Amino acid sequence: MLSSNTRGDCSDTAEEMTVDSRDSKDLSAQDIGEQKQQQMEDQLEDQLNDSRDPQNNNNNIDDDADEDAEFEEPEKANPQQDQDLGETEMEQEHDLQQEDLQQELPANSPSTPPRSPSSPQLIPKLEQPATPPSEPEASPCPSPSPCPTPKYPKVRLNALLASDPALKPDAKELTLPDSRLLAPPPLVKPDTQAQPEVAEPLLKPARFMCLPCGIAFSSPSTLEAHQAYYCSHRIKDTDEAGSDKSGAGGSGATAGDAAGLTGGSTEPPAKMARTGKQYGCTQCSYSADKKVSLNRHMRMHQTSPAAPTLAGLPSLLQNGIAPPGVTPNPMEDSSSQQTDRYCSHCDIRFNNIKTYRAHKQHYCSSRRPEGQLTPKPDASPGAGSGPGSAGGSIGVSAQAATPGKLSPQARNKTPTPAMVAVAAAAAAAAASLQATPHSHPPFLALPTHPIIIVPCSLIRAASFIPGPLPTPNSGIVNPETTCFTVDNGTIKPLATALVGATLEPERPSAPSSAAEATEAKSSPPEPKRKEAGLTRESAPLDLSLRRSPITLNSLSLRQRQLRNALLDVEEVLLAGVGTGKENVETPRGGGSVTPEQIVCAPSLPSSPSMSPSPKRRAISPRSSGAGSASSMSPPGLNVAVPHLLDMRSMLPADFGLSESLLAKTNPELALKLAAAAAAAAVAGSSGAAAFPPASLPAQTSSGNPGSGGSAGGAQQPQIYVKKGVSKCMECNIVFCKYENYLAHKQHYCSARSQEGASEVDVKSAVSPSIAGAGGLGAGAAEAASSVETTPVAYQQLICAACGIKYTSLDNLRAHQNYYCPKGGAVAAPAATPTDPGQLGMPKEKCGKCKTLHEIGLPCPPPVANPLAAPTVNPQPATNSLNKCPVCGVVSPTAALAKKHMEMHGTVKAYRCSICQYKGNTLRGMRTHIRTHFDKKTSDVNEELYMTCIFEEDASALSQELVTPTGASTTTGHDSMDHPSQMFNCDYCNYVSTYKGNVLRHMKLMHPHVAINSPSISPDTRDQDVTSNPTTNQHSNSDVSNGEAPSFHIKSEPLDPPPTVNLVHENNNSPIATPHIKAEPIEVGADAAPGGLVPPMTSPLGNSSSVAAAAAAAAEVMKKYCSTCDISFNYVKTYLAHKQFYCKNKPIRPEASDSPSPNHLGGGVAVGLGIGGLVGGHGQQKNKENLQEAAI
């Protein structure tokens, strides 16, 4: 009775406050009509509640006196402080007092009944600052029925005149209701109930305070939100337990009684009391804890509040009013309406159905894992024992039948009848699993890809949908055999039915017994994920796996489906063999596979692992081999799928490769190679045609290599598998022979300066004869056997297009699919015996010929004509665009080539083998080498004419350059290590690769002789080399096997007109010869060596000849800069050079016009005795050669 009276008092107070809040605003005529109608309804409710308890006023008068004493001081101060306050502040004060009373009464009514005041006593206290002097007459009124009648007009009048200063004295007189202290004595209660009253006044000022946190709030809704979401002391289990009790019907009491039953601490009763006082809108799902807020909300609908209808029954049930004659079906309808706009996953209520749909489509937390359009059925918590309890369906049915006894959130989560049926079927299946733990429920395996396994119990709740489905996906091949799923209102394809012929290969490999078949079907995690509505596109990303390279354009949709279906079936079969499957509990141990365990399995069937992680290899045998057919096998394989494929032979799991070192180091590659070889053998194509030696075609086109042979392989980027017994970790090179590895570590490794040659990987040395196969073999069948028997320790995967090496297959696939500059357009040809420079073969740099070829083979003959080289070598010249001259690695860009050359730390410079030009960059050397050829063609392979200068070569050079003959350091350095065509001086040991330099040298150093063309034939050069031991020392290393390569080098136009003399009186007169840039003069020695210069035995012979020769020599030397080693055609050009550009710019350029004594001494001395040796014919020839040298 006390609880019902308390509800009546709270509703009276709430209705009075509603009137005050309405009258405190400017109301229209329609609002006034609403007020009158609401007042009439409240009067009827008050009369009914007061007639039930006529003694309510006499029970709690003493307690009301105490409360009045507490409120007395603030009420005295209010008229003075709030003199200038507007109507809004009055309304806020009324609302605050109303909320305080609503908070106190339901919480204290079960424990302390005398503290619940009656409605006639609360009315003047709440309206005390604005009540007229006649208000105290209503407080001692014993009969409750006449009290509300004169109350409303006075309240309305005082609310409008609250700011009138003329009524302040009256308001002060009314703040002293001393007469109420003389009310009849209250009902005496035991002392045990009066003890909590001592602590109550301390808690009253913080009526909206979170006790654990100590934070006060201005409204109970804010406090409730804080306690539900933000409070650090909230206990989720307690809240769920409270909702479970209310859902299962365990407490059978109302919200007010539940607050008293769960007492023990003061916080839970406050929460339960607030959750029960919700004012719900009759036209939408809006609810508020204050009726004032609900009235404001009702104005949005622009309709007057009608009488309580069936749609308003939930709000009446929350307020404690029991409407008569209510059937449960309309209640379910109203709850389903609220469920349509309530998201149970996020616990958010929406006012608009459009907002709700937008939330479910874009923002809901369930769209990724489940994507359901309806809320989750909370049936299992109601049973209290999990999903496997037998009472799950009972709890669901009770929850659906009595939504009025639930809290608002629990009531809004009430499932629909279809959801109840599905949950009941699932609970029945779980109960049957618990009843018979060793017997498994029957499942239905649908012949789709992926295979969908559905429990038979779910068929009971299935419904029939006639006609075609309105799907926007027009790209579906066979819509009549496609399974769909509804995801956020859109229909998406889930699985596709398999063709009947493709199901035949699965039967021989399936287990024979029915128990093993049931175990294989229920073990994989895939079917339950499909049952829960998870598609492959909406599944969360599993970062523990790496997806296989995307080859959407390689195969058609049907071919991929057939292949993946076979792989999925193979995964089911191999699941019983492999142990340690993550998060999957197989029924072999006696346990049951619950839906929770299956859903939480992390592995994705559509993304086989491509990483060489040992953990993934040990967990799943399919992690390496499952994706091999889709990424490695040829497309023509699907032609013979129905009757030829046996997946177990195509996927020899870890137990089949236990003896192989390849399986131990990288079983992923072994499985892929074995799968590709077996696929080629099944397809009926020869291994040499479909799989070239040491190469694997990638599936990037929809061609048929089984029928096309090598022609189809030429259109696809290939992979060269280089396998060996040793690997240099610093240079990332795999060696087929251990001897080559030792030679590399001793002579060529970039880390040989830090590590000694003895620190080698001895444990990696396996028999070189076994590792000599180096690939898949000649045929595919031999390749499959070699994968299992060849004990190779290392393998490298080389991109055939650009030559970059990789140790992981997925990295190589990603490179070929996205980054390879030549993989998309032009594929590299297969390795043939006629191509010795193919990257698939192990090559080393030969110390004799300085070229890359296989160790043990004779040095290749030099190319006679570089322009004809492309006709001999079918390999495109673009493959060697950035080829490393040291190790032969081809880089796609110049920047990568430069970075690669940094690995070879001992390479100091590069030298042109044609002219001995030395450069520091590869790009500059390639540009320089192209200047030697007439045509600027792209067929020139610059690496053939480029050699490297190593650090040890420079140190050896410094020792060899000390010669007793005084030869030039530049000459000795230039002629080292390079097989090139040289031009020799006939009278000394001067050698140069430019003919003009030799002519200039002969003119300057030997002007006494008739200057002929220098010796350019190899025979003449060999004689000169033999006559000079110092030059022979360097040139022996240049010529390999007694052969000197000949080059087609562009010739300079050196034939001048014979009638033009070199020396002119007027230096400004033009010379009728082509202007060609003069080459630097390489002076062999400051003075001609003794024995080669003719002795000056004759005095002045022919004075005219001597004078002419001396004048010519002086004229030539007048235009020669010895500092920069440049000769000029004109004196003015020479003077400008000396003044502005010379390294040694003197103050007076004229002082340097005379020839240098060092260079002229020999010439003058020779000129003094030249008359007796040279005749008239020699003088004429000398002039022509001087003119040629000057040019």
UniProtKB/Swiss-Prot annotation:
SMART domains the UniProt entry points to: ZnF_C2H2
Segments of skewed composition (Low complexity): 254-266, 509-523, 602-613, 620-635
Biased composition range(s): Polar residues: 1025-1040
Compositional bias per record (Basic and acidic residues), positions renumbered to this chain: 19-28
Zinc finger C2H2-type: from-to: 279-301, 882-907, 910-932, 983-1006
Tissue specificity annotation: First expressed in stage 5 at high levels in the primordium of the amnioserosa. Also expressed in germ band extending embryos in cells of the developing anterior and posterior midgut and in hemocyte precursors present in the cephalic mesoderm. In embryonic stage 8, it is expressed in blood cell precursors. By stage 10, it is expressed in hemocyte precursors that have spread throughout the lateral and ventral head mesoderm. By stage 11, it is expressed in the dorsal ectoderm and in precursor cells of the hemocytes and fat body.
Region (Disordered): 1-153, 169-194, 239-274, 304-338, 361-413, 504-540, 601-635, 1011-1073
Acidic residues biased stretches: 61-73
Binding site for Zn(2+) 3: C728, C731, H744, C749
Biased composition (Gly residues): 383-394
Record protein name field: Zinc finger protein ush
Species whose genome carries this gene: Drosophila melanogaster
